[in-house]
Amino acid sequence: MGRDFSLKNTRNIGIMAHIDAGKTTTTERILYYTGRIHKIGETHEGASQMDWMEQEQDRGITITSAATTAEWKNHRVNIIDTPGHVDFTVEVERSLRVLDGAVTVLDAQSGVEPQTETVWRQATTYGVPRIVFVNKMDKIGANFDYAVSTLHDRLQANAAPIQLPIGAEDEFSAIIDLVTMKCFKYNNDLGTEIEEVEIPEDYRERAEEAREALIEAVAETNESLMEKIFDEQEITVDELKDAIRQATTDVEFYPVLCGTAFKNKGVQLMLDAVIDYLPSPLDVKPIVGHRADNPDEEVIAKADDDAEFAALAFKVMTDPYVGKLTFFRVYSGTLTSGSYVKNSTKGKRERVGRILQMHANSREEISSVYSGDIAAAVGLKDTGTGDTLCGEKNDIILESMEFPEPVIHLSVEPKSKADQDKMTQALVKLQEEDPTFKAHTDEETGQVIIGGMGELHLDIIVDRMKKEFNVEANVGAPMVSYRETFKTSAAVQGKFSRQSGGRGQYGDVHIEFTPNETGAGFEFENAIVGGVVPREYIPSVEQGLKDAMENGVLAGYPLIDVKAKLFDGSYHDVDSSEMAFKIAASLALKEAAKKCDPVILEPMMKVTIEMPEEYMGDIMGDVTARRGRVDGMEPRGNAQVVNAYVPLSEMFGYATSLRSNTQGRGTYTMYFDHYAEVPKSISEEIIKKNKGE
């Protein structure tokens, strides 16, 4: 059986936004109009079709990116719903990696919000073309022009409306399409009856001005359009559409649309814009990977059904009915169920038992997938997030995703022996699904420690253990993941020599330690000349340093951002061994700790707080009391926004404190930004606590 939709008629899109901008409702309406859902489910009633994990329905927020397939005007649209909460940035990152385009949903009253900025930045990093949907036009305080201005002011985006709303709040009744200069009026509550009418006289002038502005914004990226403007020639609808599509695909322009998903207005026109302006897999640059056996040799995965099969696994989930589901995006070639593939990242052969086309929480079994498709495979045992799957003859590894290390930890203790075994299984599965979630057993205390990107992240993990895996656990207080580093340089010697009858142990190294740039990690340089340390022992020196750095030099936290240059040493023909050089390296690090001025680093969070003006003084005082540094303030509508950097250790329980300081009218978001040195007094406390004093 051949493909149902050509590559040209395929769209892989994500829907991204700040929490509560109406993203899930928007996706829901898309599924309703494309005939995938017969009853509309409201997020605030906890019944949305995309939010299919229990936690998501309880909290009314989207956590996992469910992939859904829909059809519109003879096109296949694969939609990935991405979470808007900062603790789940990993979900956003991994979905952006496999998309060709995205719809950014804004709240018509708030415009660009803090999390919109974060997601927008991530999308820019991955070069994802976007259209913008200004949602909630029916809301009190909705202001389309203000929302568009925030795209310019806060994101410096070359964005211009391709639609204008007629009315706002309760009066929002129709939408003017500036490309075709037609007006669409909604006559019923479900938004299925749309009438094309003339643009009202009192809007005509404004619409013409907005169309001029649109043409100028697009012409900046298009020479032939610019020439037509200079020659004062008429620009046809098709020419304008083509120019908008080209500029959008090149990520040089962002068309802005309007509507209200909740009141069913503007969603079909937004679907039309997805088809008209967002790229098909053929329009985006082919993805470049490298050969598995030679990282320097580039290989291109071309969007072509006849090419060798290559796909990227971007999400792993445990499904109660079919077990492990691996979501993947096909970049080239085709795959049939029952066939074998190679996981080139891990060098393993895997069998694809079944292929499922996902629709939020129902599924349809299909026999084949083609280039450009997004589907889920059942039966892959060893494949994890970011792994490349390819044909058995192919040898490509696609660029994987990088995930941040956890910044917050807490201990979990099973309540009974039965819970113990279930918890071990649950933690293995949850780590498979979420690369930013880590679990390990503390060697000294025997406690299980879990780590993640924020309090909400770990709350939801514990919640899932209880609901999905029936694990009852006691949870400890959150702990901050501190780090250590050196502030000054020193050259030191590490010598290990042991003679106790028979064969001895001997290793001797001279290493120069210097501070590395923030975030650059550990760098090891071998500067040995003349074989004073034989080549076979060099990796042991590096490994010995890495192992010792894991346990730190001050308070047991990992040592980061340090350069180590091995420049001298000596060895013994008989007594030297890999182990002896490992120990010598760790002794050198101990010696360096005395001379290199080690310090403790703490995670600093970028915090954005929004509240009514009258609470400004209290909030600023509170930020300062938490050792925070205010980075700027700006008015947003009738509220004030404070941007600050605050240590994570001072942010526990902040939600409660903010609620009481603002009578429940303040909101905040925070995400990890960088590591910074801890003040001396606090550093001493941390060291004492860790030494059990």
From Swiss-Prot:
Disulfide bonds: none annotated. It comes from the Bacteria. SUPFAM superfamilies: EF-G C-terminal domain-like, P-loop containing nucleoside triphosphate hydrolases, Ribosomal protein S5 domain 2-like, Translation proteins. Residues 8-282 form the tr-type G domain. The keyword Heme does not apply. InterPro entries: EFG_II, EFG_III, EFG_III/V, EFG_IV, EFG_V, EFG_V-like, EFTu-like_2, G_TR_CS. SMART domains: EFG_C, EFG_IV. Keywords: Cytoplasm, Elongation factor, GTP-binding, Nucleotide-binding, Protein biosynthesis. GTP binds at residues 17-24, 81-85, 135-138. GO terms for biological process: ribosome disassembly. Its main location: cytoplasm. PROSITE patterns: G_TR_1 (PS00301), G_TR_2 (PS51722). One of its GO terms (cellular component) is cytoplasm. One of its GO terms (molecular function) is translation elongation factor activity. It is found in: Cytoplasm. Pfam families: EFG_C, EFG_III, EFG_IV, GTP_EFTU, GTP_EFTU_D2. Belongs to the TRAFAC class translation factor GTPase superfamily. Classic translation factor GTPase family. EF-G/EF-2 subfamily. Catalyzes the GTP-dependent ribosomal translocation step during translation elongation. During this step, the ribosome changes from the pre-translocational (PRE) to the post-translocational (POST) state as the newly formed A-site-bound peptidyl-tRNA and P-site-bound deacylated tRNA move to the P and E sites, respectively. Catalyzes the coordinated movement of the two tRNA molecules, the mRNA and conformational changes in the ribosome. This is Elongation factor G. It comes from Staphylococcus intermedius.
